[in-house]
């Protein structure tokens, strides 16, 4: 066992040869390197698989022995200061290693086919392998200096991948936005690291925690300064994990390739912030109010992310806000002191979200055969629908990921989210109400995404919904070039599902329309589609290749079974809670005297309540977004609510207000754009004006005045001595007269 730990230092460096060899190959042998480009995908998967096997071995030893291993190399600069570099293997490290490698391998296999026709194929795999190296180095770091170095490398890789298609202005701006937003958090992290080094004199985690606890117990620290340093450390995690108010970069990060979205949202960049808080939790729990601040940021992010996901049209943006909300749950759990629940949800969410993103990538890949390569069209759920019979495997996988995120048993996220929700009651009833309500919102918007994508009919084949033109509402070329705009610029997504033939908005209609041979006749008691008299033959999406489906099927298995790792049952000598063994010893401020086990009755009582809330959210989603030829088409209960009146008008205003809030991202981006971006530009313009007109203007003005005075004097002189003597005596006389009159006035006064 000791020998296995001794060689753990090699873990971050195993994927590193791939980007190095790709770079050298493109520099020295560009033609051969490009012709053998598929070989690099195999090498990337192979090296990361070796890391995964090594990590599994370490994890098994962690579960059996609960040991912690640290190895440090010291570089002594002088007698007073030395730099120490090493690696730390503990339960948190082993969990993150398994997570990074398993998700990373699935994404790499998926990317081989997804990126096969992209000219940046080699660049993509170089970035991906370096991304894995950076994240593996981050989680094995033994001190804050190493954390910061690999933290920045993770950020660099994410910026490169977000702006992978840098020739697209939108992608370039998204990259810049991610960079600038994370600069704020990273600067705070650096200041926090320096602050705690100034307090304790150490960067090593063990020494830092021990020295700081001694200082706290002896009351030898300034609590205001300590709290400020802790908040600065936490700011780094806030930016990296897209917590409010530094969350604005995450939805725009969807401009990168879909496999990158899966990796960033599941196991790398956004997980880094959660990892940092979990690693520093022994430091945070002894600082007054910082834990409350962490939980406050978490609960705000939980609710904000869910509300912003309600009306997104882009499938990847909807999933991005879902990630933001789920990361808020993890941050809430850490702030409550429920360390096990936070890491449990990090694991289950990673596999479920990777499944959803790879499933969405499969959908986008299939839609590109219809709309061409144009993310605004291939990712737009307005143009989707009816994909169930065309991509059945993708549909099934996406449904399982959706149900998992909704919290439906026995899927993965049910077990972890239920644990966080139950712990929230012990922490704060207000936080618990918000967290439970958001669980219902999660079920609603995830079911909405599923219904709009897979159920109903393929909207891309229908004509202009406004009834004014006989052209498709998207004029789509094969290569996704700009076509005609949507006829109604401000139309809402639900409007497409509730327009009557005459163009008037209505929720309810009993008319029967025959659409075409591919869509059967339908009666629409609720959300109705306008009548399209189109009988043309269209092409349809097809299922993705096996190379893309294989990782999706593996992630289905993880989504089905990974939740059983943390089942908190321990009865009759049978302990099923593998996760608790893995995390021994762990921190839990809410269950200090508990062995992390509950009885069957308490479990079922809590589970029924959480599943009921999720089911209610799913029902509301079906109520609003159900397919137009669903089995509920004759449900007259819905039509009983049709009557228009003041209440209906008021409810529509509320609904439209919620839609505007969600679709406009809570106006937070607009606020930043107005008050920060524009404000900084105005300040820069004022500084430029002050520098040019005031700072430079004063000496320039003196020089200019001196120049003109000199010119005047020069014009007076003609080169004659008599003229010089005349002016000299004149000036002296004037001076003497002034002096005389001043003395006279002084004597008189």
Swiss-Prot record:
<feature type="transmembrane region" description="Helical">
    <location>
        <begin position="125"/>
        <end position="145"/>
    </location>
</feature>
<keyword id="KW-0618">Plastoquinone</keyword>
<feature type="transmembrane region" description="Helical">
    <location>
        <begin position="425"/>
        <end position="445"/>
    </location>
</feature>
<feature type="transmembrane region" description="Helical">
    <location>
        <begin position="396"/>
        <end position="416"/>
    </location>
</feature>
<feature type="transmembrane region" description="Helical">
    <location>
        <begin position="354"/>
        <end position="374"/>
    </location>
</feature>
<feature type="transmembrane region" description="Helical">
    <location>
        <begin position="694"/>
        <end position="714"/>
    </location>
</feature>
<feature type="transmembrane region" description="Helical">
    <location>
        <begin position="9"/>
        <end position="29"/>
    </location>
</feature>
<feature type="transmembrane region" description="Helical">
    <location>
        <begin position="608"/>
        <end position="628"/>
    </location>
</feature>
<keyword id="KW-0150">Chloroplast</keyword>
<keyword id="KW-0812">Transmembrane</keyword>
<dbReference type="InterPro" id="IPR001516">
    <property type="entry name" value="Proton_antipo_N"/>
</dbReference>
<feature type="transmembrane region" description="Helical">
    <location>
        <begin position="219"/>
        <end position="239"/>
    </location>
</feature>
<dbReference type="Pfam" id="PF00361">
    <property type="entry name" value="Proton_antipo_M"/>
</dbReference>
<feature type="transmembrane region" description="Helical">
    <location>
        <begin position="40"/>
        <end position="60"/>
    </location>
</feature>
<dbReference type="GO" id="GO:0008137">
    <property type="term" value="F:NADH dehydrogenase (ubiquinone) activity"/>
</dbReference>
<feature type="transmembrane region" description="Helical">
    <location>
        <begin position="89"/>
        <end position="109"/>
    </location>
</feature>
<comment type="subunit">
    <text>NDH is composed of at least 16 different subunits, 5 of which are encoded in the nucleus.</text>
</comment>
<feature type="transmembrane region" description="Helical">
    <location>
        <begin position="290"/>
        <end position="312"/>
    </location>
</feature>
<dbReference type="Pfam" id="PF01010">
    <property type="entry name" value="Proton_antipo_C"/>
</dbReference>
<protein>
    <recommendedName>
        <fullName>NAD(P)H-quinone oxidoreductase subunit 5, chloroplastic</fullName>
        <ecNumber>7.1.1.-</ecNumber>
    </recommendedName>
</protein>
<keyword id="KW-0520">NAD</keyword>
<feature type="transmembrane region" description="Helical">
    <location>
        <begin position="258"/>
        <end position="278"/>
    </location>
</feature>
<dbReference type="InterPro" id="IPR002128">
    <property type="entry name" value="NADH_UbQ_OxRdtase_chlpt_su5_C"/>
</dbReference>
<dbReference type="InterPro" id="IPR003945">
    <property type="entry name" value="NU5C-like"/>
</dbReference>
<feature type="transmembrane region" description="Helical">
    <location>
        <begin position="327"/>
        <end position="347"/>
    </location>
</feature>
<dbReference type="InterPro" id="IPR001750">
    <property type="entry name" value="ND/Mrp_TM"/>
</dbReference>
<dbReference type="InterPro" id="IPR018393">
    <property type="entry name" value="NADHpl_OxRdtase_5_subgr"/>
</dbReference>
<dbReference type="GO" id="GO:0042773">
    <property type="term" value="P:ATP synthesis coupled electron transport"/>
</dbReference>
<keyword id="KW-0472">Membrane</keyword>
<keyword id="KW-0934">Plastid</keyword>
<keyword id="KW-0521">NADP</keyword>
<comment type="function">
    <text>NDH shuttles electrons from NAD(P)H:plastoquinone, via FMN and iron-sulfur (Fe-S) centers, to quinones in the photosynthetic chain and possibly in a chloroplast respiratory chain. The immediate electron acceptor for the enzyme in this species is believed to be plastoquinone. Couples the redox reaction to proton translocation, and thus conserves the redox energy in a proton gradient.</text>
</comment>
<comment type="similarity">
    <text>Belongs to the complex I subunit 5 family.</text>
</comment>
<dbReference type="GO" id="GO:0015990">
    <property type="term" value="P:electron transport coupled proton transport"/>
</dbReference>
<keyword id="KW-0813">Transport</keyword>
<feature type="transmembrane region" description="Helical">
    <location>
        <begin position="185"/>
        <end position="205"/>
    </location>
</feature>
<feature type="transmembrane region" description="Helical">
    <location>
        <begin position="549"/>
        <end position="569"/>
    </location>
</feature>
<keyword id="KW-1133">Transmembrane helix</keyword>
<keyword id="KW-1278">Translocase</keyword>
<feature type="transmembrane region" description="Helical">
    <location>
        <begin position="725"/>
        <end position="745"/>
    </location>
</feature>
<dbReference type="Pfam" id="PF00662">
    <property type="entry name" value="Proton_antipo_N"/>
</dbReference>
<feature type="transmembrane region" description="Helical">
    <location>
        <begin position="147"/>
        <end position="167"/>
    </location>
</feature>
């Amino acid at each position: 066992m000791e020998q296995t730990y001794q060689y753990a230092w090699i873990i971050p460096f195993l994927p590193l040869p791939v980007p190095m060899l790709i770079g050298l190959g493109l520099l020295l042998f560009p033609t051969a390197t490009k012709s053998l480009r598929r070989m690099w995908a195999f090498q990337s998967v192979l090296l990361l698989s070796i890391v995964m096997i090594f990590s599994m071995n370490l994890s098994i030893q962690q579960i059996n022995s609960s040991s912690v291993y640290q190895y440090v190399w010291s570089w002594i600069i002088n007698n007073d200061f030395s730099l120490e570099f090493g690696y730390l293997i503990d339960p948190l490290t082993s969990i993150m290693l398994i997570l990074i490698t398993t998700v990373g391998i699935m994404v790499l296999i998926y990317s081989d086919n997804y990126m096969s026709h992209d000219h940046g194929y080699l660049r993509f795999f170089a970035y991906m392998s370096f991304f894995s190296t950076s994240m593996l180095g981050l989680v094995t770091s033994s001190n804050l200096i190493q954390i910061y170095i690999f933290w920045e490398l993770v950020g660099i890789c994410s910026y490169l991948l977000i702006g992978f298609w840098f020739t697209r202005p939108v992608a370039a701006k998204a990259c810049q936005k991610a960079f600038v937003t994370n600069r704020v958090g990273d600067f705070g992290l650096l200041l926090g690291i320096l602050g705690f080094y100034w307090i304790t004199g150490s960067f090593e985690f063990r020494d830092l925690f021990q020295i700081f606890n001694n200082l706290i117990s002896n009351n030898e620290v300034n609590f205001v300064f300590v709290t400020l340093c802790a908040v600065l450390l936490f700011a780094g995690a806030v930016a990296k994990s897209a917590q409010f108010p530094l969350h604005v970069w995450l939805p725009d990060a969807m401009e990168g390739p879909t496999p990158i979205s899966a990796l960033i949202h599941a196991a790398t960049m956004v997980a880094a912030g959660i990892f940092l808080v979990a690693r520093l939790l022994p430091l945070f729990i002894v600082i007054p109010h910082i834990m409350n601040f962490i939980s406050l940021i978490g609960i705000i992010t939980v609710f904000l992310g869910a509300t912003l996901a309600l009306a997104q049209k882009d499938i990847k943006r909807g999933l991005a806000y879902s990630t933001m909300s789920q990361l808020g749950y993890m941050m809430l759990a850490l702030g409550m002191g429920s360390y096990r629940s936070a890491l449990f949800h990090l694991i289950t969410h990673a596999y479920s979200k990777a499944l959803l993103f790879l499933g969405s990538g499969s959908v986008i890949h299939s839609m590109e055969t219809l709309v061409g390569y144009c993310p605004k069209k291939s990712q737009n759920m307005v143009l989707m629908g009816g994909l169930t019979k065309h991509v059945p495997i993708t549909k099934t996988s996406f449904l399982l990921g959706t149900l998992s995120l909704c919290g439906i048993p026995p899927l993965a996220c049910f077990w972890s989210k239920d644990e966080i929700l139950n712990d929230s009651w012990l922490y704060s009833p207000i936080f618990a109400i918000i967290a439970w309500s958001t669980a219902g919102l999660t079920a609603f918007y995830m079911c909405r995404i599923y219904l709009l994508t897979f159920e109903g009919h393929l909207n891309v084949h229908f004509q202009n919904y406004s009834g004014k033109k006989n052209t498709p509402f998207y004029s789509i070329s094969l290569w996704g070039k700009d076509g005609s705009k949507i006829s109604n610029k401000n139309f809402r997504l639900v409007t497409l599902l509730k327009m009557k033939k005459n163009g008037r908005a209505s929720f309810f209609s009993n008319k029967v329309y025959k659409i075409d041979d591919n869509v059967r006749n339908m009666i629409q008691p609720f959300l109705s589609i306008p009548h399209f008299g189109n009988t043309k033959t269209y092409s349809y999406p097809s299922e993705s290749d096996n190379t893309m489906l294989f990782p999706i099927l593996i992630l289905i298995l993880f989504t089905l079974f990974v939740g059983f790792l943390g089942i908190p049952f321990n009865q009759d000598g049978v302990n099923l809670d593998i996760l608790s063994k893995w995390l021994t010893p762990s921190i839990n401020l809410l269950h200090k005297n508990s062995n992390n086990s509950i009885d069957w009755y308490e479990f079922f009582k809590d589970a029924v309540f959480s599943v009921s809330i999720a089911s209610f959210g799913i029902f509301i989603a079906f109520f609003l977004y159900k397919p137009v030829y669903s089995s509920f088409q004759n449900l007259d209960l819905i039509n009983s609510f049709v009557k228009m009146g003041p209440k209906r008008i008021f409810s529509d205003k509320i609904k439209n207000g919620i839609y505007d809030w969600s679709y406009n991202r809570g106006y937070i981006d607009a606020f930043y754009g107005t008050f920060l971006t524009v404000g900084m530009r105005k300040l820069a313009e004022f500084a430029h004006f002050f520098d040019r007109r005031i700072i430079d203007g004063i000496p320039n003005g003196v020089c200019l005045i001196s120049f003109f005075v000199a010119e005047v004097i020069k014009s007076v002189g003609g080169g004659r001595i008599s003229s010089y003597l005349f002016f000299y005596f004149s000036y002296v006389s004037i001076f003497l007269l002034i002096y005389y009159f001043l003395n006279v006035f002084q004597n008189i006064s």
